[in-house]
Amino acid sequence: MVLSANDKSNVKAVFAKIGGQAGDLGGEALERLFITYPQTKTYFPHFDLSHGSAQIKGHGKKVAEALVEAANHIDDIAGALSKLSDLHAQKLRVDPVNFKLLGHCFLVVVAVHFPSLLTPEVHASLDKFVLAVGTVLTAKYR
């Protein structure tokens, strides 16, 4: 997925505004993922999956930090997430569709907390961005 200059600007602007809340948003997105797509819980049998769990919040923060890292290096997402891509492809072996599902959940959480930010144009840019991140994370599966 090719991000235009306008897409990149939109993504950077959103991440600048969500700033310090990214970790909380990541936790909420992960919890939403588990509720909406219960099959995704299979990768976390050792987690306390109850509402507000410290483990969900902690992993959600890692997810958000990866998205922030990708946004900060939007011209080289593959380079920024290379180690994470290796981890998911070689060790964790997460089904690639789950990245798309989690990306969608993250967009929903951003929309809930920052509705004025999510204009149709910005929504399209963020959608392209999370798809690009998912593509990078699954690139080493082959």
Curated annotation (Swiss-Prot):
Keyword Heme included in the entry's annotation: yes
GO biological process: hydrogen peroxide catabolic process
Cellular component annotations (GO), alphabetically ordered: blood microparticle; haptoglobin-hemoglobin complex; hemoglobin complex
UniProt keyword annotations, A-Z: Heme, Iron, Metal-binding, Oxygen transport, Transport
Residues reported in the UniProt entry to bind O2: H59
TM regions (residue ranges): none
PROSITE patterns from the UniProt entry: GLOBIN
Residues that hold heme b according to the record: H88
Globin domain mapped to chain residues: 2-142
An annotated Gene Ontology molecular function: heme binding
Tissue-level expression: Red blood cells.
Signal peptide segment: none
InterPro entries recorded: Globin, Globin-like_sf, Globin/Proto, Hemoglobin_a-typ, Hemoglobin_oxygen_transport, Hemoglobin_pi
Function statement: Involved in oxygen transport from the lung to the various peripheral tissues.
Family in the record: Belongs to the globin family.
Record text on subunit structure and interactions: Heterotetramer of two alpha chains and two beta chains.
Name of the protein described by the UniProt record: Hemoglobin subunit alpha-A
UniProt lineage: Eukaryota, Metazoa, Chordata, Craniata, Vertebrata
Gene name per UniProt: HBAA
